């Protein structure tokens, strides 16, 4: 009897509510302080366990390449290698999040793959063990595996659960692809923001140290942010290109979305301190 397909595993987007760069390490990585919060806007993945070890990925988006560099396949392969599981999986990705926009879609897809297959393969790794696998694939992956809003330090791997407010956001995805590597290699990027205690950071105005540089180099980002600032406190997430405005009421965010210029694309979503992946995990 063929295995059933396990459906609707969410891979939520994240926002960096603030992002401070505190320095550059000898290995080239940057020391950061940032606040991650999920939003209820997700890619969705389906999985079918197979008896043979092949890993097969299908996607609804032509830009998703199912090769050895794909994070979903790398995550599944890493779980196979770590656990010695000799079966495989067929995976379907319904890609909804903008690619390369600073919303963490690729990292979230990889995290959901690790969490879902650990359940479906009955490999029984702990959350910490999954996070260690994830960290080798990308610095943002552990926060998606743990599934709670978090204050992060180091290169983003040291996480502390936090509980910020859960407002509504209007997220705009400018028609620009910002290279994270280029941003972090740019000599004009500020790298000297002092490290502060979490209580201080949570109570002061929030900012993104990458924003000024990205806005200066990408006019599409500058235009989107300038428009959004007319309606709400707004800033960039990650290294861009997406920007977000914060609203207390859903209707306020939807009203602003209705006025969005035709050349821009956006969506409204609510902040979530508990990832929908954790909710899905309780109904495998």
From Swiss-Prot:
Any keyword Cell cycle?
no
Pathway assignment = Isoprenoid biosynthesis; isopentenyl diphosphate biosynthesis via DXP pathway; isopentenyl diphosphate from 1-deoxy-D-xylulose 5-phosphate: step 3/6
What does UniProt list as catalytic?
A: 14, 140
Print the keywords alphabetically: ATP-binding, Isoprene biosynthesis, Kinase, Nucleotide-binding, Transferase
One GO MF term? 4-(cytidine 5'-diphospho)-2-C-methyl-D-erythritol kinase activity
| Top-level division of the source organism's lineage | Bacteria
Coiled-coil region list: none
> What does the record give as the reaction this protein catalyses?
4-CDP-2-C-methyl-D-erythritol + ATP = 4-CDP-2-C-methyl-D-erythritol 2-phosphate + ADP + H(+)
Q: Which residues bind ATP?
A: 98-108
Q: Which Enzyme Commission number(s) are on file for it?
A: 2.7.1.148
Q: Which GO terms describe its biological process?
A: isopentenyl diphosphate biosynthetic process, methylerythritol 4-phosphate pathway; terpenoid biosynthetic process
Q: Which InterPro entries does the annotation name? A: GHMP_kinase_C_dom, GHMP_kinase_C_sf, GHMP_kinase_N_dom, IspE, Ribosomal_Su5_D2-typ_SF, Ribsml_uS5_D2-typ_fold_subgr
**Record's function text:** Catalyzes the phosphorylation of the position 2 hydroxy group of 4-diphosphocytidyl-2C-methyl-D-erythritol.
Family the entry assigns: Belongs to the GHMP kinase family. IspE subfamily.
Q: Read off the NCBIfam families from this record.
A: ispE
Q: What is this protein called?
A: 4-diphosphocytidyl-2-C-methyl-D-erythritol kinase
The source organism is: Shewanella baltica (strain OS195)
């Amino acid at each position: 009897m063929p295995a059933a397909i396990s459906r609707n595993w969410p891979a939520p987007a994240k926002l960096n509510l603030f992002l401070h760069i505190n320095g550059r390490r000898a290995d080239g990585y940057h020391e950061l302080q940032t606040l991650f919060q999920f939003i209820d806007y997700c890619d969705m993945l389906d999985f079918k366990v197979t008896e043979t070890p092949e890993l097969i990925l299908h996607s609804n988006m032509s830009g998703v390449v199912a090769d050895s560099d794909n994070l979903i396949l790398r995550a599944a392969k890493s779980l196979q290698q770590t656990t010695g599981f000799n079966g495989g999986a067929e995976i379907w990705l319904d890609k909804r999040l903008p690619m390369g926009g600073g919303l963490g879609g690729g990292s979230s897809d990889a995290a959901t793959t690790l969490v879902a297959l650990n359940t479906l393969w009955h490999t029984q790794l702990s959350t910490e063990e999954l996070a260690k696998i994830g960290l080798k694939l990308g610095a943002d992956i552990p926060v998606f595996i743990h599934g709670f809003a978090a204050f992060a330090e180091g290169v983003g791997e040291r996480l502390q659960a936090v509980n910020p407010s859960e407002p509504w956001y209007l997220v705009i995805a400018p028609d620009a692809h910002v290279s994270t590597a280029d941003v972090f290699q740019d000599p004009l990027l500020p790298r000297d923001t002092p490290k502060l205690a979490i209580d201080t950071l949570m109570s002061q105005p929030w900012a993104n140290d990458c924003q000024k540089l990205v806005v200066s180099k990408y006019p599409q980002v500058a235009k989107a942010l300038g428009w959004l600032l007319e309606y709400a406190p707004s800033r960039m997430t990650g290294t861009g290109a997406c920007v977000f405005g914060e609203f207390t009421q859903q209707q306020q965010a939807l009203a602003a979305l209705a006025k969005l210029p035709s050349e821009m694309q956006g969506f409204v979503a609510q902040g979530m301190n508990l990832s929908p992946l954790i909710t899905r995990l309780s109904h495998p």
